[in-house]
Amino acid sequence: MINSVGVVRKEAENCNCLQVFFVSGSFKVDSVEAKKKEENFRETLRDMANSKYEYVKSFELEDEVMLPNLMVVRIDGRDFSRFSQVHEFEKPNDETALNLMNSCSAAVLEEFPDIIFAYGYSDEYSFVFKKTSRFYQRRASKILSLVASFFAAVYVTKWKEFFPQRKLLYAPSFSSKVVSCASAEVLQAYLAWRQQDCHANNQYDTCFWMLVKSGKSVSETQEILKDTQKQQKNELLFQKFGINYKTLPELFRQGSCLFKKKVEETVKHDENGNPVKRLRRKAVFVHSENIAGRSFWNEQPSLYNDLGHFTKDIGKIEPDFIRSFQFENKLLPLTWVVVRIDGCHFHRFSDVHEFEKPNDEQALKLMNSCAVAVLEEFEDIHFAYGVSDEYSFVLKKESELYKRQSSKIISAVASFFTSTYVLQWGEFFPHKELKYPPSFDGRAVCYPTYNILLDYLAWRQVDCHINNQYNTCFWMLVKSGKNKTQSQDYLKGTQTREKNELLSRQFGIEYNSLPVIFRMGSSVFRLKEAENGVVSGKKLEGEVVVDHCNIIERCFWEEHLHILSYS
């Protein structure tokens, strides 16, 4: 126990951590004057700490997709070969699963008005934004993670609608990326490339599974199809199985495209019962043999007005175009990568779902459970810190997850977290319906040193304290009868000490006695593996646990060197 403010000041000057105020009961005060000095010092420490740690924001890089480039977000099912096998999808195509994907894409177009066109097949979908879009300030990481996250949430939400007799056994997730197209011509090449891929993959898969079903082994089938051309595959299907490839459902051969067009809808009925109709922009599904053809594209005003005309039909796709479509930005090697996700419009989400204010413990526990699932899913993630509707995930310094491709890492984490959130909702809110799918946006930031990484985590915990203290005061004032504007005005310009006095004097609340989960947030990490193979206590080695601890003081990290494998 620290016995005087002077000693505390000396300790603060000699210590890397300035957030002494986080440690409940760290001060022993014998007089009113000493108490005031202590409170003033706590406030000073808070301001110093906040200004000390905020420099870590400078490591965040801009990833704006510059105008006039067109933005395309492509999502792909993450390890959907396994997912389709576990959930017993029909081979080579499961029509119900494809209809589920299409339904999710329709929800995406409804959720994000800037998305004009979508094309998908199998477990992938491409979403094209209008050329003038300024959605999320055109920040690539935010956009790609948000689309993947929302798609994953809708996929889980709609599962029972399409598979009422089949349980969703684990959370699906999607990787995504932003493809930047410099012109309508480049977009045309991109769409042609994806539809050609749809045809090639479907033709191969149809041959493959027909051979397997006829008794061939997987290796035999692969050998038979090796180096075969399009015509040879068509002949194999017709001669051996009586299948004319061109008569297979368009859904399988051509994929599905979705775009908004004006359609006539009945909006009401007049006093005589006659329908009153209006033209509305509505997303419609179309199957076309050539979605990149002029005859298809230029007949749709909504497409050429928002995305541009196709001036000629495309033949062979330029190899340079394909290389640009496949390009991936990679994170710097041997740096600490932090993926931070934030709830999208969670103020509204918490209001609609009637979360308790200022903190809903069940909602926080749901977030923590999702974070645990993320650590269990991704072995390279060694630590996570969360508060409210945000979570930061720290990858080990040497991680080669997804070859350090930032878009895949961000989207995989964000979408897996989101689908887990939806999947586990009923466990934490058994009597509360999930009224609409949540979504999270994400970013990845590289921190070059261990100390800077710890400063980042300290900054997030400082922010936790500041926000929780303000929100506690705000909602207590609202519950006491003030409206939100009055409460905001009342708290404007108040310092830490004044907020603590408000809580104590007006509401009988001692801030440091509030649940530690609210004040310190949640840390998620694996327990240290015992060197001799024996683990003391009830918890297993390597088990992922949730704790609520002071991660600002370096003593926590010194006691848990195994978390970041640093010494």
Curated annotation (Swiss-Prot):
Mg(2+) 2 binds at D342, D389. InterPro entries: Thg1_C_dom, tRNAHis_GuaTrfase_cat, tRNAHis_GuaTrfase_Thg1, tRNAHis_GuaTrfase_Thg1_sf. It is an enzyme of class 2 (transferase). Its cofactor is Mg(2+). One of its GO terms (cellular component) is nucleoplasm. It catalyses: a 5'-end ribonucleotide-tRNA(His) + GTP + ATP + H2O = a 5'-end phospho-guanosine-ribonucleotide-tRNA(His) + AMP + 2 diphosphate + H(+). GTP binds at D342, G343, C344, H345, F346, H347, S388, D389. There is a cross-link at K397, K403 (Glycyl lysine isopeptide (Lys-Gly) (interchain with G-Cter in ubiquitin)). Gene3D superfamilies: 3.30.70.3000. GO terms for molecular function: GTP binding; magnesium ion binding; tRNA guanylyltransferase activity. Binds 2 magnesium ions per subunit. Its main location: nucleus. Keywords: GTP-binding, Isopeptide bond, Magnesium, Metal-binding, Nucleotide-binding, Nucleotidyltransferase, Nucleus, Transferase, tRNA processing, Ubl conjugation. Mg(2+) 1 binds at D342, G343, D389. Its EC number is 2.7.7.79. Pfam families: Thg1, Thg1C. One of its GO terms (biological process) is G2/M transition of mitotic cell cycle. It is found in: Nucleus, Nucleoplasm. Belongs to the tRNA(His) guanylyltransferase family. Adds a GMP to the 5'-end of tRNA(His) after transcription and RNase P cleavage. This is tRNA(His) guanylyltransferase 1. It comes from Arabidopsis thaliana. The lineage of its organism: Eukaryota, Viridiplantae, Streptophyta, Embryophyta, Tracheophyta.
